[in-house]
């Protein structure tokens, strides 16, 4: 059985580094907005959706922050103010600290 080949770099999936490179190159913005009834919502945007599965990432962040959330228009929305925690977790997941902007 042949190993799966990455369509971007042509290497086998276990040797592929496309996702790590993509994580380091992205400019991610994390900020909080007020929604209905004065509720806070953490918005995370700036991901390259061709490489990163936003639904899977949102699921992990919701589990870590113990909150609800969704994916809309290439952004992740989490209920509550989780800016610091999300930034720390993204760094642990391999995103560059320099590419994350917290407002």
UniProtKB/Swiss-Prot annotation:
One of the record's GO molecular function terms: translation initiation factor activity
PROSITE patterns in the record: SUI1 (PS50296)
One Pfam family from the record: SUI1
Keywords: Protein biosynthesis, Translation regulation
InterPro entries: DENR/SUI1_TIF (IPR050318), SUI1 (IPR001950), SUI1_arc (IPR022851), SUI1_arc_bac (IPR005872), SUI1_dom_sf (IPR036877)
Domain of life per record: Archaea
GO biological process: formation of translation preinitiation complex; regulation of translation; translation reinitiation
Keyword Protein biosynthesis: yes
Record HAMAP family: SUI1
Family designation: Belongs to the SUI1 family.
NCBIfam families the record matches: PRK00939.1, SUI1_rel
Protein name: Protein translation factor SUI1 homolog
